[in-house]
């Protein structure tokens, strides 16, 4: 790109280069004008643990007093704090340039959807300009030897960010590299349970990581059912929150989201022993205290049977015994006609 007059760095392009950034703006605005309604900006300012900085003063401050002769834009020596001011100048100028591009896209289409999946951090400030931000926990793929381990790895990051650190960022506006399905080496039940637990996090931006040639007919059916469920409960996602204990400590945990007429609760027992979990249906889960209505219970994972009551009100205690590795999702609605019939079998959803 350099030979064509574009400002390049060691790893990628300069986010403050006048020629390159104007070309980028012109092109994405052209695409938006042609009907493209989704943009994913990835690799901004580098990628994962690699960072690229503008050292030549192109569109940002130059600091020759730092003696940068012989430095590359991703030089490890830039980790020294004496270069922080220069790096801040570049990141600030580059971010301001991106803001102008995001605003231009919004002018073309107010409903345009923008994901910034690198070069950002979990601050609600970003949501003035974009719709979702990558979780940025340096783990594209959730680690673990099985689905249970994958869920614990990612859900523990959620627990750390929202329960331990109390980060003020809406959970539905984060992006993960999930759900994934890359092979046939699991039962349909294991994939189903993993999928619904994953979706119950309330991520408003669901990007599938699948190898289509590896999916069976049942996998496609499960995927379709899961996405239909996510679409049904999507209006609840902006209220989603985490409940329960620590995934890392093998305590029962899950996610909860409600509005005035419906809600859901997911549960995961990551341990190798049976556990009984008690939770009160109140404001801490997101229920509205002024709502005096009966919520009927069903489950997208099967019949709810006698393990929970057929209906609940605000302030009721829900008690559920979960088998080792079990996943359960409960739907609550005050419209009796919209939930599946209650059977005699319990929910049995073991994540292998």
What are these regions (language model features)?
Residues 1-169:
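Aromatic- and carboxylate-enriched substrate-binding clefts and catalytic-loop regions
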Residues 7-14, 248-252, 315:
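Active-site-adjacent structural elements in folded domains
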Residues 35, 258-260, 312-313:
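Generic beta-strand structural signal
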Residues 76-80, 301-308:
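Short, basic/aromatic beta-hairpin or loop at an interaction surface
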Residues 90-305, 317-329:
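Active-site-proximal substrate-binding groove within the catalytic cores of carbohydrate-active enzymes
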Residues 309-352:
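C-terminal beta-strand-rich structural cap/linker in extracellular carbohydrate-active enzymes
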């Amino acid at each position: 790109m350099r030979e064509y007059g574009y400002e390049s760095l060691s790893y990628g392009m300069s986010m403050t280069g006048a020629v390159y950034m104007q070309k980028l703006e012109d092109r994405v605005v052209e695409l938006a004008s042609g009907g493209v309604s989704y943009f994913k900006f990835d690799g901004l300012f580098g990628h994962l643990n690699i960072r690229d900085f503008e050292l030549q003063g192109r569109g940002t401050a130059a600091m020759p007093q730092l003696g940068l002769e012989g430095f590359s834009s991703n030089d490890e020596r830039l980790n020294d704090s004496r270069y922080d001011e220069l790096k801040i100048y570049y990141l600030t100028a580059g971010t301001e340039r991106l803001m102008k591009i995001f605003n231009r896209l919004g002018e073309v289409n107010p409903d345009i959807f923008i994901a910034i999946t690198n070069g950002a951090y979990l601050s609600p400030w970003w949501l003035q300009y974009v719709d979702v931000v990558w979780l940025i926990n340096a783990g594209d793929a959730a680690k673990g030897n099985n689905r249970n381990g994958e869920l614990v790895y990612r859900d523990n990051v959620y627990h750390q960010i929202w329960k331990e650190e109390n980060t003020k960022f809406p959970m539905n506006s984060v992006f993960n590299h999930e759900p994934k399905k890359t092979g046939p080496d699991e039962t349909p039940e294991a994939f189903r349970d993993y999928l619904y637990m994953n979706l119950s996090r309330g991520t408003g931006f669901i990007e599938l990581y699948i190898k289509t040639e590896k999916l069976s007919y049942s996998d496609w059916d499960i995927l379709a059912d899961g996405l239909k469920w996510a679409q049904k409960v999507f209006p609840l996602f902006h209220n989603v929150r985490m409940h329960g204990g620590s995934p890392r400590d093998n305590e029962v945990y899950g996610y909860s989201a409600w509005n005035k007429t419906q809600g859901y609760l997911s549960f995961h027992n990551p341990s190798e022993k049976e556990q009984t979990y008690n939770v009160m249906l109140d404001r801490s889960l997101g229920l509205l205290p002024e709502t005096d209505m009966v919520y009927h219970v069903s489950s997208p994972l099967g019949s709810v049977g006698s393990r929970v009551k057929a209906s609940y009100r605000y302030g009721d205690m829900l008690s559920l015994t979960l088998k080792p590795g079990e996943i359960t999702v409960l739907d609550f609605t005050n419209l009796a006609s919209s939930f599946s019939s209650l059977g005699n079998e319990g929910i049995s959803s073991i994540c292998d």
